[in-house]
Amino acid sequence: DVNKETHEVFFTHRGKQYSVIGDKVVFAVGRAGSRVFLDWCKRNGVACTNNQVDIGVRVELPAMVWEHFSKKIYEPKILYRSKAYGDTTRMFCFNERGLVVTENTDGVLTVNGHAYKELDRKTDNSNFALLCTIRFTEPFNDPIDYARYVASLANKISGGSVLVQRLGDLESGRRTDEKRLKQSTVRPTLNAVPGDLSLCMPKRQLDNIIETLHALDKVAPGTANYDTLLYGVECKYYSARPDCVDFEIKDCPGIYALGDGAGFTRSLSQAAANGLIIGEILTKK
């Protein structure tokens, strides 16, 4: 904890509690510490803005489908505005001949993807994230818990894992079971539980995802194939951003916030640059 009046910082190390006092205090907590930072802001009356979250799936398909893009572009990124709702769905985090993997964030399992540089570790599949951005309005103001709840439903339905479903089964209103998955021409790179994503993901997000896949199919034929695999759930959180001036929290003189944990950046490189900027600000003061 941090006392905003005295700048006393309380922490625990090896089971013992300590405290230090600094002229300047910087919150650089990362995404994993965003909840701790938000709780501190609430206790100290610091206004924060954040009312959106990205929820969707990890798409896996034969590498040849997007090969004509991946040979020219390191990472294809495409934004699509759905006709049904006007929501934005984005394709990003493209991994050519990569693997679908799981992430554990505070006990909630979600999906992600990566690819190895070594040729002998390449696969026959490529994968990418396909997420729908949802912006909430008042009175709801906890998008992170909303996303965690959706992801936890997938964990519960899958018996403590994540789900995988063929696109064709999803569109036909059928659950993908072990038998159907074995019939798929796309061999999964993650040992996920075959299931039905419509039982855990909201209809609006699923509609957006299906519509986007068919739009992508027009530029990369085969994207919306019956056997295209969808893993769920994948989430990207936007941390709450405090009211600041030059990263100094309003009404908290000498206390600063930066990086992903404070909602100012969305990547390691951006967070690192943010740290350099605050370093320059502090040295000038």
Which residue stretches match the model-derived regions?
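Residues forming the flavin
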Residues: 1-285
